[in-house]
Amino acid sequence: MREILHIQGGQCGNQIGAKFWEVICDEHGIDQTGKYAGDSDLQLERINVYYNEASGGRFVPRAVLMDLEPGTMDSLRSGPYGQIFRPDNFVFGQSGAGNNWAKGHYTEGAELIDSVLDVVRKEAENCDCLQGFQVCHSLGGGTGSGMGTLLISKIREEYPDRMMLTFSVFPSPKVSDTVVEPYNATLSVHQLVENADECMVLDNEALYDICFRTLKLATPTFGDLNHLISATMSGVTCCLRFPGQLNSDLRKLAVNLIPFPRLHFFMVGFAPLTSRGSQQYRALTVPELTQQMWDSKNMMCAADPRHGRYLTASAMFRGKMSTKEVDEQMLNVQNKNSSYFVEWIPNNVKSSVCDIPPTGLSMSSTFVGNSTSIQEMFRRVSEQFTAMFRRKAFLHWYTGEGMDEMEFTEAESNMNDLVAEYQQYQDATADEEEEYDEEEEEEAA
């Protein structure tokens, strides 16, 4: 079976992860003690993608939970599903990273990383055919960003041929939690560009907007935001866990979405998003789902796809529907909005259909798009980074942990290169291709 090993780090990662396991347990009919209480064999057929079966018929998540302070883990453990995790898989320090990337990556995190890797190895050895890792973390803090990227690079060394998928929460433009977010995020992106295979980019502000505008919540909590994220996470892997007419897995997703290795930062969306009270009044159709999932208001990161072009995209539908209708709708989207797709990748939308819808819905769809407009996010972080770095503000917190200013400069230029690459492919047309080859040859020469 194609197992996925789930890793969550830092406060944000652990809170998203906790919500994710609630959703997955719900879909597979696992109760809060880890016992199966479902009603369909399909729930059990491929349950070992995310669960180990332990003695006494208990199902234990393949999850590794790490943090540099015990607080979030304690509340997770006392939460509704706290008892289903394997106790040994909680790895935490006492010191905290204090929103400092250097602490997470070089000092505190480096002390804890070996015990995390031991747990990861143990879990990986339990797998029959490990497909890859999914990591939940934020890029604005210290642990999720610093220690998260450290773990990703270590796993990369040890399991070079396995997929590495991250769900990364970027700092938002308007909602800022800490002053040094731009530093932490830039240093993390520097790592993610090199070591991750696929990054799903999330951002609190866009999630808040969805909660206000679409879900009509007056006071959205982090719980509501994390619920949105976990719906998407579940959608990305539903094809691995339930039978479907058109399957997709992490590797197929990567092959279809990544035209150039560095450009692996995706926007994600989910449909249907309806406010909590009004779900029962909606009859869903494939055209409605399609329209909603391509809507820029549905994107879970603060970049507007109308400001760029899609290099590639993938749509994962769930529920009983005809594949013919799905294909027609996807073609329809591409034909009507052809200016928003690059013309030098002809059929650039992949679709997959899984027969089992999520709990409480008759059908749903998950959208993953590789759009050049994601550069807006990097650009925004980069501007904030430069503003502070020019004055060397807050740098002593990082150099004090043994970092060098050079690292900051490298991370900054790597991020700017990334933005430039996105821009280059946004402007490229099908008939210009030869020019680029010549330019590259000149550069090489």
From Swiss-Prot:
Cofactor names: Mg(2+)
Localization terms from the record: Cytoplasm, Cytoskeleton
Keywords for this protein: Cytoplasm, Cytoskeleton, GTP-binding, Magnesium, Metal-binding, Microtubule, Nucleotide-binding
Domain of life: Eukaryota
GO biological process: microtubule cytoskeleton organization; mitotic cell cycle
UniProt keyword annotation of Iron present: no
Protein function: Tubulin is the major constituent of microtubules, a cylinder consisting of laterally associated linear protofilaments composed of alpha- and beta-tubulin heterodimers. Microtubules grow by the addition of GTP-tubulin dimers to the microtubule end, where a stabilizing cap forms. Below the cap, tubulin dimers are in GDP-bound state, owing to GTPase activity of alpha-tubulin.
PANTHER family, alphabetized: TUBULIN
Subunit structure: Dimer of alpha and beta chains. A typical microtubule is a hollow water-filled tube with an outer diameter of 25 nm and an inner diameter of 15 nM. Alpha-beta heterodimers associate head-to-tail to form protofilaments running lengthwise along the microtubule wall with the beta-tubulin subunit facing the microtubule plus end conferring a structural polarity. Microtubules usually have 13 protofilaments but different protofilament numbers can be found in some organisms and specialized cells.
Protein name, per record: Tubulin beta-3 chain
Organism per entry: Triticum aestivum
Recorded name of the encoding gene: TUBB3
